[in-house]
Amino acid sequence: MRALFYKDGKLFTDNNFLNPVSDNNPAYEVLQHVKIPTHLTDVVVYGQTWEEALTRLIFVGSDSKGRRQYFYGKMHVQNRNAKRDRIFVRVYNVMKRINCFINKNIKKSSTDSNYQLAVFMLMETMFFIRFGKMKYLKENETVGLLTLKNKHIEISPDKIVIKFVGKDKVSHEFVVHKSNRLYKPLLKLTDDSSPEEFLFNKLSERKVYECIKQFGIRIKDLRTYGVNYTFLYNFWTNVKSISPLPSPKKLIALTIKQTAEVVGHTPSISKRAYMATTILEMVKDKNFLDVVSKTTFDEFLSIVVDHVKSSTDG
């Protein structure tokens, strides 16, 4: 697809707006079907027919903070939402196997690669931190789980604090209390005398990918699952603890905000980029709140998974 530059309803082949696109270009048909927000700047529209645009990226623009915003066709969004539903169910179905792997290897006396993989997976399934590719650390000093260093771990007698700066320069902080099962394994891995050494110094991207492959999922699937799991836990907790309950709309907005704070991004990104829409539609139902109030979290999670699964099967 060719990138065309947009200004005042017109398209150009160059970003200086000197060479206008022909009026019969199919991209103009696309513009008749979409509304480009007026606050966006540096807008690029992709040359394609309206039929093609339904399943593809349509245009990109910068918001007031300079962040690039991406707008996709309706069918692309529907397919993406359905994919999130499938990922949520798929990861839920393998969590027992993942926990078995963790339990088996975290008991090792040595800190070999399998032990480190167990600690890595335990941290990922607790905090759902971004993977942390080495190239991003080198390019812009973005830290993720794999690229954590000893200097990012602060140890005290009753807790461990994990602090680092991740994607988009967002500061992250996770607390591991002494009573948590992660405390001792993390303490065992950390070497205060080598602050610049990687925490997972016996792992590589390849080793982590090979490990996660045995469960039939991708490492990024755990984060998608984690955002939805965290949302559901917060939603369940809010229904149980807030009195009187706000409207479903306000309750969902509050829960998305809480979830975004935990996983380290904005509420809009949580909703747009990670949330399974089937889950959001399900919790909008006022009658469903009565069900939530009478269940344990595990029962609630099982009900949600069954509903999402039936939606994807249908």
Curated annotation (Swiss-Prot):
Q: Active site located where?
A: Y274 (o-(3'-phospho-dna)-tyrosine intermediate)
Q: Which SUPFAM superfamilies match?
A: DNA breaking-rejoining enzymes, DNA topoisomerase I domain
Entry-linked InterPro entries: DNA_brk_join_enz, DNA_topo_I_N_sf, TopoI, TopoI_cat_a-hlx-sub_euk, TopoI_cat_euk, TopoI_N_vir, TopoIB_AS
Q: Which enzyme type, at the first EC level?
A: isomerase
In the induction comment, the record states:
Expressed in the late phase of the viral replicative cycle.
EC?
5.6.2.1
Q: Which Gene Ontology cellular component terms are annotated? A: virion component
- CDD domains per record: Topo_IB_C
Q: Where is the Topo IB-type catalytic domain?
A: 77-314
Q: Which reaction does it catalyse?
A: ATP-independent breakage of single-stranded DNA, followed by passage and rejoining
Q: Which UniProt keywords apply?
A: DNA-binding, Isomerase, Late protein, Topoisomerase, Virion
**Compartments, record wording:** Virion
Q: Which PROSITE patterns match?
A: TOPO_IB_1 (PS00176), TOPO_IB_2 (PS52038)
Q: Which one GO biological process term can you cite for this protein?
A: DNA topological change
Q: Name one GO molecular function term.
A: DNA binding
Q: Where is this site: Involved in religation?
A: D168
Highest taxon of the source?
A: Viruses
Question: Where is the major localization of this protein?
Answer: virion
Q: What does this protein do?
A: Releases the supercoiling and torsional tension of DNA introduced during the DNA replication and transcription by transiently cleaving and rejoining one strand of the DNA duplex. Introduces a single-strand break via transesterification at the specific target site 5'-[CT]CCTTp site in duplex DNA. The scissile phosphodiester is attacked by the catalytic tyrosine of the enzyme, resulting in the formation of a DNA-(3'-phosphotyrosyl)-enzyme intermediate and the expulsion of a 5'-OH DNA strand. The free DNA strand then undergoes passage around the unbroken strand thus removing DNA supercoils.
Q: Which family does it belong to?
A: Belongs to the type IB topoisomerase family.
Q: What is this protein called?
A: DNA topoisomerase 1
The record lists the organism as: Variola virus (isolate Human/India/Ind3/1967)
Q: What is the lineage of its organism?
A: Viruses, Varidnaviria, Bamfordvirae, Nucleocytoviricota, Pokkesviricetes
